[in-house]
């Protein structure tokens, strides 16, 4: 397992506790052009102790068979993601410079069905509306998944963390096992934000709140860039791959 240089000083156990792999996208090749796109998931459900992915074409597939779906997709090269420390996502911006962000982009080389399943779950947790009971069922299923490889451990820990954040923000779940997985910076930001809203409502009798909270990083900005993250990533990936599909600008990082 090769980690970005900025993370190499931590013990392995610490890495899984304080970092996540976020903003997972598909990497695709068409002719000589390499690009990224969203996963084709529009919903996620849990039934019969299995995770089910609802795809754009109307089909519903068992999460464990998602690997075969991906491998049959024309031009599919794998997934990319971004390694973030807990202190770097404030729910408003990403506390990375453009240079730092490039070094955090990882090319996920996956082999196991479970790894594809976990990538799909991470994407769903960040981008899709998910019911509270579904979150609880997902949490229970992920706990039962046997993970041995570093990439699987990181993806599973990311799923557990995102589930806890969603439970905390959208369902006001403040049980200790939930709070233990919610990064302190998110707790601080969210509590201060809700306190300000309560104060405004108290004095001005206003219950309107247009500030919606989302875990998707696509519309977040980096510290020194006015671009949305998704636009930055598209540009970085385009620059990174030559016609022979070799990494140039960004440091290619494999978790295997």
From Swiss-Prot:
GO cellular component: host cell Golgi apparatus; viral tegument
Keywords recorded for this protein, A-Z: Host cytoplasm, Host Golgi apparatus, Virion, Virion tegument
Protein's cellular compartments: Virion; Virion tegument; Host cytoplasm; Host Golgi apparatus
InterPro entries per the UniProt record, alphabetical: Herpes_UL7 (IPR002600)
Superkingdom in the source lineage: Viruses
Pfam families found in the cross-reference section: Herpes_UL7
Chief localisation class: virion
HAMAP family assigned: HSV_CEP1
Annotated function: Plays a critical role in cytoplasmic virus egress. Participates in the final step of tegumentation and envelope acquisition within the host cytoplasm.
Family named by the database record: Belongs to the herpesviridae cytoplasmic envelopment protein 1 family.
Name by which UniProt lists this protein: Cytoplasmic envelopment protein 1
Lineage of origin: Viruses, Duplodnaviria, Heunggongvirae, Peploviricota, Herviviricetes
């Amino acid at each position: 397992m090769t980690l970005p240089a900025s993370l190499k000083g931590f013990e392995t156990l610490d890495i899984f506790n304080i970092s996540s792999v976020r903003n997972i996208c598909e990497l695709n090749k068409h002719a000589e052009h390499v690009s990224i796109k969203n996963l084709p998931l529009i919903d996620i459900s849990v039934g019969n102790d299995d995770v089910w992915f609802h795809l754009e074409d109307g089909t519903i597939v068992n999460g464990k068979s998602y690997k075969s779906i991906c491998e049959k997709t024309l031009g599919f090269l794998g997934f990319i993601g971004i390694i973030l420390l807990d202190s770097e996502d404030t729910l408003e911006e990403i506390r990375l410079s453009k240079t730092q962000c490039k070094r955090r982009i990882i090319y996920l080389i996956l082999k196991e069905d479970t790894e594809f399943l976990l990538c799909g779950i991470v994407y769903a947790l960040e981008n899709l509306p998910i019911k509270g009971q579904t979150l609880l069922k997902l949490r229970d299923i992920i706990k039962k998944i046997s993970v041995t490889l570093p990439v699987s451990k990181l993806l599973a820990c990311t799923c557990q963390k995102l589930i806890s954040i969603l439970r905390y923000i959208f369902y006001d779940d403040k049980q200790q096992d939930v709070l233990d997985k919610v990064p302190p910076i998110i707790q601080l930001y969210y509590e201060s934000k809700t306190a300000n809203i309560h104060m405004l409502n108290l004095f001005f009798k206003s219950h309107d709140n247009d500030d919606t909270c989302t875990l998707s990083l696509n519309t977040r900005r980096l510290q020194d860039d006015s671009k949305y993250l998704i636009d930055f990533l598209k540009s970085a990936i385009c620059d990174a791959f030559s016609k022979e599909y070799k990494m140039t600008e960004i440091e290619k990082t494999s978790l295997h």
